[in-house]
């Protein structure tokens, strides 16, 4: 979910619309779970059901991962995917909330199907999207076959991606959520994996979605706050780890934080009972669990392995996959395989 309400505070001058080609030769750490969920929600049939193979296994995530990654590589974007590890205990409440919402959505989906309401069925089918361990492992296998690096985070993927960006190992972190800024990423790119012509939910309307760059330094300077205060604001309005203080929205939180200086004083002034929860979440954003155990190497794709995974195992159309592989190989040769770019892209962690 992330801190969606935080977008209200992002100054317009700190947002920059990008063309995919403008990211050529830039490396980006992409939040894998966030991206795969987008594919699961968006890539569906007319009835709202996800794409499946002959054995009934969901393949929407693989389709999105394969074709969208090729699109990014064709534009010279050196993308690496960062996968979540064990969620922090702080997130237990949020995970339970999401599971309950998915269960409710599944029931409403079945009811809509019985009524013959296609639009409602599609809406609730998207809301009930699930990402299993098996699906995650399939995604990793496909990325390896494509020669695209992936990183296993010890905890939150966004925290790891932000760490990699802060170290300068990648140019930016990419996610639909704003948590990357809270975790200290100097640069966040949104809409990277979903750019292009997209249909609005429940409407027969299409819009052009373009990548958007948000710079942390600009946000802090324009709001006149520190990163610590930005985290305090987020914790007050609600995150994956805190429910948010009742009656406190983004602008009110900004005013309180600037007035009192830090989170603990604001919590005391507001008479918040569960102060420890908010302070624990605050400290987690500032000191998340991350690792240096990763390599960023864009290797030569393995066409036969890709065909085995997509065509033989999951019934993808062989002709279409082979044509996409041709694009992938062309992108690798032209954008990723030169000696100089290999030097630029290789970061071996000690």
From Swiss-Prot:
Q: How is the cofactor bound?
A: Binds 2 magnesium ions per subunit. They probably participate in the reaction catalyzed by the enzyme. May bind an additional third magnesium ion after substrate binding.
E.C. number: 3.1.-.-
What GO molecular functions are on record for this protein?
A: 5'-3' exonuclease activity; 5'-flap endonuclease activity; DNA binding; magnesium ion binding
Query: What are its cofactors?
Result: Mg(2+)
Segments carrying the region annotation (Interaction with PCNA) are 339-347
One GO BP annotation of this record: DNA repair
Q: Which UniProt keywords apply?
A: DNA damage, DNA repair, DNA replication, Endonuclease, Exonuclease, Hydrolase, Magnesium, Metal-binding, Nuclease
Q: Per the record, which residues fall in region N-domain?
A: 1-102
- What ranges does the record give for the region I-domain, renumbered to this chain? 120-261
Tell me the residue numbers annotated for binding Mg(2+) 1: 31, 84, 156, 158
**Residues involved in Mg(2+) 2 binding:** 177, 179, 240
| A matching Pfam family | XPG_I
Q: Which SUPFAM superfamilies match?
A: 5' to 3' exonuclease, C-terminal subdomain, PIN domain-like
- Belongs to which family? Belongs to the XPG/RAD2 endonuclease family. FEN1 subfamily.
Summary of subunit composition and partner proteins = Interacts with PCNA. PCNA stimulates the nuclease activity without altering cleavage specificity.
Q: What does this protein do?
A: Structure-specific nuclease with 5'-flap endonuclease and 5'-3' exonuclease activities involved in DNA replication and repair. During DNA replication, cleaves the 5'-overhanging flap structure that is generated by displacement synthesis when DNA polymerase encounters the 5'-end of a downstream Okazaki fragment. Binds the unpaired 3'-DNA end and kinks the DNA to facilitate 5' cleavage specificity. Cleaves one nucleotide into the double-stranded DNA from the junction in flap DNA, leaving a nick for ligation. Also involved in the base excision repair (BER) pathway.
Protein name (record): Flap endonuclease 1
List the source organism: Ignicoccus hospitalis (strain KIN4/I / DSM 18386 / JCM 14125)
């Amino acid at each position: 979910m992330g801190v969606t309400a935080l977008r209200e505070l992002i100054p317009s001058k700190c947002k920059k619309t990008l063309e995919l080609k403008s990211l050529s030769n830039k490396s980006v750490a992409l939040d894998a779970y966030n991206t795969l969920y987008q594919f699961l929600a968006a890539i569906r049939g007319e009835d709202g059901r996800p794409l499946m193979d002959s054995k009934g296994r969901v393949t929407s995530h693989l389709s999105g991962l394969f074709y969208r990654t090729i699109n990014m590589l064709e534009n010279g974007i050196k993308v690496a995917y960062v996968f979540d590890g064990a969620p922090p205990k702080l997130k237990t409440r949020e995970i339970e909330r999401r599971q309950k919402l998915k269960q409710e959505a599944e029931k409403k989906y079945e009811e809509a199907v019985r009524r013959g309401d296609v639009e409602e069925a599609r809406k609730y089918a998207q809301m009930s999207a699930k990402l299993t361990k098996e699906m995650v492992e399939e995604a990793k296998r496909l990325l390896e076959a494509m020669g695209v690096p992936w990183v296993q985070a010890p905890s939150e993927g966004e925290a790891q991606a932000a760490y990699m960006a802060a170290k300068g190992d990648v140019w930016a972190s990419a996610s639909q959520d704003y948590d990357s800024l809270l975790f200290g990423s100097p640069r966040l790119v949104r809409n990277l994996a979903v750019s292009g012509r997209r249909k609005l939910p429940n409407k027969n309307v299409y819009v052009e979605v373009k990548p958007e760059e948000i710079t942390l330094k600009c946000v802090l300077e324009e709001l006149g706050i520190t990163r610590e205060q930005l985290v305090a604001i987020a914790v007050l309005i609600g995150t994956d780890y805190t429910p948010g203080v009742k009656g406190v929205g983004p602008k009110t939180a900004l005013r309180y934080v600037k007035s009192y200086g830090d989170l603990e004083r604001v919590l005391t002034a507001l008479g918040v009972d569960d102060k420890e929860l908010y302070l624990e979440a605050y400290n987690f954003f500032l000191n998340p669990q991350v690792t240096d155990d990763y390599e960023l190497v864009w290797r030569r794709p393995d066409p036969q392995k890709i065909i085995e995974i997509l065509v033989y195992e999951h019934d993808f159309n062989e002709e279409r996959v082979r044509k996409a592989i041709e694009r992938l190989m062309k992108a690798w040769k032209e954008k990723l395989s030169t000696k100089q770019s290999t030097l630029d892209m290789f970061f071996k962690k000690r």
